[in-house]
């Protein structure tokens, strides 16, 4: 159909040209002959390279100015509000206005088309990049702040790589506009280039050359745009070994964590109300209950992701890890670096040990896009443990694992919890998981917005625990 469309266009053009002279409308055959004569002359290619150089210069300047402005506008709303009126001013004026201004400033020559290209595509770059920064996955930022990754590294390894797809999409958007802006600038105020050659042909009434140049410009523009559309850049970044992150933790001063009369509201509705709970140090505590009972909210309060509660939360250690329900892996870092970024002091062999514990040591240098959901969950757990936390929060940590991996992982975590000084709090709906891994359990109710049953599990017979927990869940405490 594509070839049929082109053929039909050429036939119609040829038929119409029969009713006019070549001075008014040359036919496609003579136009193609003229085009081949032009491209056989080195002067033509010199003109073309000059136009291409102007386009490239305008693009580089636009990216050099627009990307940093868009980056900081995306990070800082006040800065965005400050520059937005000026950028919109650039965006609103027609091209001929900038040609007139640039002719006053630069005269006729190389810089006028470059300036026109800059002012035409610069606003699009700024707005697209700022929108890209604002749409950066907030879960990744939340994860980075939990692990106390410095702001400089968040910018370097999360924010900045996240704008690369937006830079690529912006190039695809502006490609045709850039090419046309340069040619128009050359046509009206150039001293060299394809647009300038087109203006000379027009001035001398050489209609065959006008049409030949037009066909070439259309073809070159299409090729330029199609080439950019094929760009599909997925950033891949390696973490340097010399980054430093320090955490000061007084390990000899860890105490039981206490929640005293804690109330937290969301959209003017209490999620938990006057909650009192103790999480014993170096023990594993479990939270169960129906959806909406506040289990995950408690994890978020302890991790300081959620704020604005009333009451008191005491003795939360500085180093807190969180095994999220979603994986929250940084897409452009491999598995090794997704772990290293939370604890840069680890060597690759140390990271391999954590991955081996999860049964995925062979995935150490694979990127997240190549991992299954279960593998991502295991990397999530390995990262949390590699942080060497004093409080480990786990939100449905085994939900996407197969049974064999799940049982093996539970046994591994039991060993870790018994040998290391880790206080852990787990949210789960599975009585088996809770009975195997927990020392104490709290059952929460969405109706009461509080704890309705609690049980010390250490002194219970293991074979009875799962049934006891299941019965309590079904009967609501």
Identify the function of each model-found stretch.
Residues 145, 348-363:
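Conserved ABC ATPase "signature" region
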Residues 303:
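Helix-to-loop junction immediately C-terminal to a conserved catalytic motif
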Residues 369, 387:
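Conserved signature/switch motifs of ABC ATPase nucleotide-binding domains
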Residues 392-396:
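Catalytic Walker B motif of ABC-type/P-loop ATPase nucleotide-binding domains
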């Amino acid at each position: 159909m594509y070839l049929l469309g082109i053929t039909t266009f050429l036939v119609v053009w040829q038929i119409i040209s029969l009713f006019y002279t070549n001075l008014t409308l040359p036919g496609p055959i003579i136009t193609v002959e003229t085009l081949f004569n032009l491209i056989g002359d080195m002067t033509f290619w010199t003109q073309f390279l000059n136009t291409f150089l102007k386009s490239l210069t305008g693009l580089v300047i636009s990216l050099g100015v627009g990307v940093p402005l868009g980056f900081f506008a995306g990070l800082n709303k006040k800065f965005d509000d400050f520059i937005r009126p000026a950028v919109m001013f650039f965006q609103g004026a027609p091209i001929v206005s900038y040609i007139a201004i640039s002719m006053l400033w630069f005269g006729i020559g190389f810089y006028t088309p470059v300036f026109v290209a800059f002012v035409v595509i610069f606003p699009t770059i700024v707005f697209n990049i700022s929108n890209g920064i604002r749409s950066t996955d907030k879960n990744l930022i939340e994860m980075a702040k939990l692990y106390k990754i410095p702001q400089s590294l968040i910018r370097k390894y999360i924010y900045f790589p996240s704008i690369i797809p937006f830079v690529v999409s912006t190039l695809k958007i502006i490609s045709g506009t850039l090419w046309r802006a340069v040619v128009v600038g050359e046509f009206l105020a150039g001293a060299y280039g394809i647009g300038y050659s087109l203006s000379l042909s027009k001035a001398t009434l050489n209609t065959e050359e006008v049409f030949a140049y037009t066909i070439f410009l259309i073809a070159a523009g299409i090729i330029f745009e199609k080439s950019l559309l094929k760009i599909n850049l997925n950033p891949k970044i390696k973490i340097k070994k010399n980054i430093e992150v320090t955490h000061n933790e007084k390990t000899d001063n860890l105490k039981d964590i206490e929640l005293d009369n804690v109330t937290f509201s969301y959209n003017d509705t209490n999620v938990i109300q006057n909650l009192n709970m103790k999480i014993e140090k170096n023990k594993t505590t479990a939270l169960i209950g129906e959806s909406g009972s506040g289990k995950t909210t408690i994890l978020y309060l302890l991790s300081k992701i959620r704020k604005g509660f009333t009451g008191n939360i005491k003795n939360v250690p500085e180093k807190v890890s969180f095994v999220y329900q979603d994986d929250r892996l940084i897409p452009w870092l491999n598995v090794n670096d997704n772990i290293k970024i939370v604890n840069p002091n680890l060597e690759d062999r140390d990271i391999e040990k954590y991955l081996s514990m999860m049964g995925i040591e062979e995935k150490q240098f694979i990127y997240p896009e190549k991992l299954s959901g279960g593998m991502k969950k295991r990397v999530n757990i390995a990262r949390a443990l590699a942080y060497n936390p004093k409080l480990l929060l786990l939100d449905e940590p085994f939900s996407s694992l197969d049974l064999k991996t799940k049982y093996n992982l539970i046994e591994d975590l039991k060993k870790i919890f018994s040998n290391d000084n880790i206080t852990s709090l787990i949210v789960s709906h599975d009585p088996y998981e809770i009975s195997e891994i927990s020392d104490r359990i709290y059952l929460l109710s969405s109706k009461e917005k509080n704890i309705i049953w609690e049980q010390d599990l250490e002194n219970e017979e293991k074979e009875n625990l799962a049934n006891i927990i299941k019965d309590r869940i079904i009967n609501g405490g």
